[in-house]
Design a protein with these regions (language model features):
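Conserved RNA-binding domains used in RNP assembly and mRNA/RNA metabolism
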Residues: 1-85
Length: 85
């Protein structure tokens, strides 16, 4: 199965790049699985999302917290893949 890697803009203005999977869930339950999300900083520089708070690399979030999804540029995708090997 091919990975779906997207740039994600969250409602709190955080910009992430992550493998993302839609999962079935009950209403109100998290329905998006982020796998190895990286926060995008200026440059663009990447850092593991919530790295100061957890070693976890898989997160469940509600899709209503996502403003938009976009395809990453080839350069950003390559950088993400290098960081998540």
């Amino acid at each position: 199965m091919d990975k779906t890697i997207k740039v994600i803009l969250l409602m709190n203005s955080e910009r992430l790049i992550s493998e993302i999977e839609e999962v079935s869930a009950d209403i109100g339950e998290p329905d998006c699985k982020l796998i190895k999300p990286m926060e995008i900083w200026e440059g663009p520089n990447l850092a593991p999302w919530m790295m100061d708070h957890t070693k976890q690399d898989t997160f469940m979030i509600n899709s209503d917290k996502i403003i938009t999804l976009a395809d990453p540029t080839p350069t950003l995708l390559e950088k993400y893949e290098d960081c998540t090997k």
